[in-house]
Amino acid sequence: MRVAGIIVEYNPFHNGHLYHLQKTREITNADIVVGVMSGNFIQRGEPAIVNKWARTKMAILNGVDVIFELPFAYACNSAEIFAYGAISILNQLGVDFIVFGSECGDIDKLKETAKHLAFEEDDFKSSLKSYLKEGYSFPKARELALIKTCKTNIEFSSNNILGIEYIKWIYRLNSKIEPFTIRRIGASYNDPNLTQDTYASATAIRRNINNLHAIKNKMPSVSYEILLEEFESGRGPVILEDYFKLFIYNAIVVPDFLKNKIDVKEGLENRFEKYIFNSPSAKNLLENVKTKRYTLTRLQRIFIHAIVRNNFDQKALLSITPYVRVLGFNYKGKEYLNKIKDKIEYITKLNQQWLKNPQYKELLELEIRSSMLHALQYKDFHKYLQTEFKSSPIYISSRS
């Protein structure tokens, strides 16, 4: 059985994602495609516009055979930690291939750059340290160090960076996964504008989420219908601004609310304190706090980690093995799960037994807490606060 893995967020599932899925099957000739998907919060430090169960349903109905969860601690984090979590899960599953989108579309260039990161040499480390001292953000400092010491000419754009991180962790974990990349088509990852093209970025779709007619042709019909159902049921769209008052509340009642929180360094908490009580919105606050080193995306993650009360040791995340949890599957996925169940332990129904497992306890507690915070924004929020314990994987039995 040939198994291909993809790493996704599906926020929401759009035409570009369908193209990626189709090309994955075409390139690898895979019998099964499994996805590792972010839960209720995504890598950019934002809540997913609809919950992970709705997005899992989109994925399965559009042809992904199994969706596994990328735990919150990894999903809402830097590219390095995000990639480690996802590759670690795919490696546990023993997939044969990974296929990801990139701006360059050249796997050899990405591999070469990833090798320099996987096996850091002294001149690279020295250059990185120097650029960090100059006040650059870590991603920018690393980019400059690579250009200087490795003579790489690759563009350090969003998907290229993630692709490099995926390959880096394949090398570091001594994984047998074979990586492939496809060139992104249509709008760039961060393009906020809708065009006549049927391929739009997820960013553009989210920005125009209140104009459902405008985004209808940018998504497969089944994705659009699920999105509409979630909105009509009061379970979305969930956005970062929904949490601004909660953030302020914490700043009021918790002394030194941000001190010693994840990624809060060099007196960053003082910049937050300077602006927090004079800012009309989360967007305004974060724009004011932003510096050359602290990018908007990084600040959004700090914002989310603070309200979720995430104190997980970030270095430890790169040395532990994340749990494997099934969110949904189809009839082919069911056969695959039955085939691997004797080789790997995976979660289908979350219960107290899993929470007592010291290996996964903290990761699962964070997942539960983040999901409850997501549910707080729903119309009938009280019905969904215990969803993590009530939900079983979504099963789509149709063979059509």
Swiss-Prot record:
It is found in: Cytoplasm. One of its GO terms (cellular component) is cytoplasm. It is an enzyme of class 6 (ligase). Its EC number is 6.3.4.-. GO terms for biological process: tRNA modification. GO terms for molecular function: ATP binding; ligase activity, forming carbon-nitrogen bonds; tRNA binding. ATP binds at residues 7-20, 101, 159, 184-185. Keywords: ATP-binding, Cytoplasm, Ligase, Nucleotide-binding, RNA-binding, tRNA processing, tRNA-binding. Its main location: cytoplasm. InterPro entries: Rossmann-like_a/b/a_fold, tRNA(Met)_cyd_acetate_ligase. It catalyses: cytidine(34) in elongator tRNA(Met) + acetate + ATP = N(4)-acetylcytidine(34) in elongator tRNA(Met) + AMP + diphosphate. Belongs to the TmcAL family. Catalyzes the formation of N(4)-acetylcytidine (ac(4)C) at the wobble position of elongator tRNA(Met), using acetate and ATP as substrates. First activates an acetate ion to form acetyladenylate (Ac-AMP) and then transfers the acetyl group to tRNA to form ac(4)C34. This is tRNA(Met) cytidine acetate ligase. It comes from Caldicellulosiruptor bescii (strain ATCC BAA-1888 / DSM 6725 / KCTC 15123 / Z-1320) (Anaerocellum thermophilum).
